[in-house]
């Protein structure tokens, strides 16, 4: 439980949701003059963005909302502008921005927050990023301890878990697809990272591709398998590249 003195908090995972929580905590701690020490455990190279908005992924991966509907107001005093003013070159209001560009912005927001906290003396929020995963949790006498890289960290008053989209047990349909791929020697590939999918697809010319699901990710996959391999869309329809 949090008290009036310095409270230690651990965050497992970050990404956009975790970044939003950190920014809110920074604002709250400054307004209420409460001190927090926060350890963030996330092995991802761009923890502010997370894998779904990887700044290094293919620009063929697009958001499903146009630029005009993206409202990402930064905290006051953060020293960074909103996404529309930050991104260069500017993106038209009716265009759907590449997810990697939004990921780069989210990572810049995190770096601005880290720089802001490290550059202040007597700040209310102290942030430490540990680029590692957490293997185990335990609670002793009301406090939490985390095992990461063979070392126990803690004690922590509170734990915030932001797992994103962790691996889960395959459902019946995916299990059937896995069995089919194993017996037919077919390739069962994930949609992301899109660059990895694109590299694998260079060997699929003339083959039939089945896409599991039909949502945002499926449109990314379709772009990767068409324009990503050199195909073009024109007034007369689609012209494949032959790859």
Model-derived features: where do they sit?
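Dinucleotide-binding/catalytic capping subdomain of oxidoreductase cores
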Residues: 110-124, 228-243
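N-terminal extension/subdomain marker
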Residues: 7, 20, 24-28, 94, ...
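Glycine-rich active-site loop/strand segments that organize a redox cofactor
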Residues: 41-104, 108
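A conserved short coil-to-beta-strand element within the FAD-binding core of flavoproteins
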Residues: 128-143
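Glycine-rich dinucleotide-binding loop and its adjacent helix/turn
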Residues: 163-216, 220-221
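N-terminal Rossmann-like FAD-binding beta1-loop-alpha1 element of flavoenzymes
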Residues: 4-39, 210-229
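Glycine-rich FAD pyrophosphate-binding loop
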Residues: 27-52, 243
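Short hydrophobic core segments
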Residues: 134, 152-167, 210-211
């Amino acid at each position: 439980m949090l008290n009036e003195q310095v409270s230690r908090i651990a965050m497992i995972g970050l990404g956009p949701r975790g970044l939003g929580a950190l920014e809110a905590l920074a604002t709250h701690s400054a307004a209420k003059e409460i001190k927090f020490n926060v350890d963030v455990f996330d092995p991802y190279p761009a923890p502010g963005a997370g894998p779904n908005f990887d700044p290094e992924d293919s620009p063929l991966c697009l958001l499903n909302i146009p630029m005009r509907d993206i409202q990402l107001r930064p905290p006051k005093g953060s020293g960074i502008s909103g996404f529309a003013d930050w991104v260069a070159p500017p993106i038209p209001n009716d265009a759907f921005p590449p997810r990697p560009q939004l990921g780069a912005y989210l990572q810049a927001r995190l770096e601005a927050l880290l720089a802001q906290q490290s550059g202040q003396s007597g700040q209310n929020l102290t942030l430490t990023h540990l680029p590692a995963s957490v293997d185990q949790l335990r609670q002793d006498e009301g406090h939490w301890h985390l095992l990461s890289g063979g070392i126990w960290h803690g004690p922590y008053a509170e734990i915030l878990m932001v797992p994103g989209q962790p691996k889960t047990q395959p459902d019946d349909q995916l299990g059937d697809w896995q069995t089919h791929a194993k017996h037919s020697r077919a390739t069962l590939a994930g949609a992301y990272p899109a660059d990895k999918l694109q590299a694998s697809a260079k060997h699929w010319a003339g083959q039939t591709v089945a896409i599991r699901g039909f949502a945002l990710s499926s449109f990314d996959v379709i772009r990767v398998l068409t324009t990503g391999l050199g195909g073009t869309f024109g007034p007369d329809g689609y012209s494949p590249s032959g790859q």
